[in-house]
Amino acid sequence: AIKLIQDSTNRLIRYLQFYRYLYSLASEDSKTSIVEVNRLATDFLKSKNHNIELIFTRLYSIDINDHIAQIIICLIVVASNNLSKNAIIKVELEIQHDKFIGMKIVVIATNLKFDQNKTDILLGTGANSSDHSSITIENVHEYYTYYLITEYGYKLLVTPLIDSVEYTLML
């Protein structure tokens, strides 16, 4: 019983740290290390009790702006919501001259659940900023992710493939 309580407490602490970072107000001057982003995302995925392997292809030793880190984490959350038990989420960051220029998240899984309505929201084709009545508890994260992406001048491309989907973020 004590082990169960400890495990539950640790899971809740990881969730709290993750969501506190994800939904905090990022200032333009605040920076976070890519290693910390990896840790937060890994802890979050572990707490979902899925067998999801998170791979950052390059763990640079540079810091990135908090808003970029939030977008990366948002897209990892979106990707993880499309998965069944066993999957791989591969994050490929593009850094040139110590500056973030883009990234690709590749989700590989069998029985991948792809929700076109949520994807339309991510891409802005389903998002209507003047009509907040379409925001629900089920799609609020996609609206938030879309807001961050457009607020900071990025573009998102979503490519569904057989047993995988790619999310490409670019300037």
Give the ranges of each region predicted by the language model.
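Conserved DHp (HisKA) dimerization/phosphotransfer helix of two-component histidine kinases, i.e.
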Residues: 2-52
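Conserved short strand/loop->alpha-helix "switch" segment adjacent to the catalytic nucleotide/phosphoryl-transfer site
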Residues: 51-78, 129-134
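Solvent-exposed beta-strand sheet faces enriched in polar/charged residues
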Residues: 55-57, 92, 159
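Conserved ATP-binding N-box helix of the HATPase_c
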Residues: 66-96, 141-151
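C-terminal transmembrane helix-loop-helix hairpin of multi-pass membrane proteins
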Residues: 132-135, 141-144, 148, 156, ...
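Short C-terminal beta-strand
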Residues: 165-171
